[in-house]
Design a protein with these regions (language model features):
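An extended, acidic
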Residues: 52-169
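Local beta-strand/beta-hairpin segments that build beta-sheet-rich folds
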Residues: 23, 51-52
Length: 169
């Protein structure tokens, strides 16, 4: 949608999987001329500069790229939200956000590259209940996403798990 509207919050992303795991990822945002690259076990770079994810320890006050927060989450801090979930995940990878979370079904190809980019920068990436996300499944869908600083992952899961389970039934 951002591409169609002439906004900057979109990118092209490519990921290489071996089995159920992403081992190489690249994302390019043409408008901002940012190129993220990650190799499993070798870290993440953006335009050649090594990235390090947020090291936040306190959940309250965490920076979240969103347009609005539910009343129960008003202890969090809103920051600019690009439309692309992958671009939001790179915000955690480069310490411009502390938490990206969704409670909806999504295709693995939308997050595969950003998943490795965020993890190799030091972030934690799981589904909305804290479970591992596997790739190359027969049904390439997962419910929800948490991408965040390691120090707030448990609190994020605690905050979202009940909501996720209520949606899933």
């Amino acid at each position: 949608r951002d591409y169609i509207r002439g906004r900057s919050g979109w990118c092209v992303s490519v990921a290489l999987a071996e089995g159920s795991e992403i081992v190489f990822a690249a994302m390019y945002a043409p408008v901002t001329k940012q190129l993220w690259v990650a190799h499993k076990g070798e870290g993440t770079t953006c335009n050649g500069k090594r990235l390090f994810a947020s090291t936040r320890q306190d959940f309250s006050g965490a920076r979240v790229p969103t347009d609005a927060l539910p009343k129960v989450d008003r202890d969090l801090e809103m920051v600019h939200k690009p439309n692309s979930i992958a671009m939001r995940m790179t915000m955690v990878a480069c310490d411009r956000a502390d938490l990206v979370a969704t409670l909806r079904w999504g295709h693995e190809w939308d997050i595969a590259a950003a998943h490795l980019i965020a993890e190799e920068a030091g972030a934690v990436v799981t589904d909305a209940t804290g479970g591992t996300i596997f790739y190359n499944k027969p049904k390439p869908l997962d419910f929800g996403l948490i991408c965040c600083a390691p120090g707030i992952h448990d609190a994020a899961v605690d905050r979202l798990k009940g909501r996720a389970e209520a949606i899933l039934g």
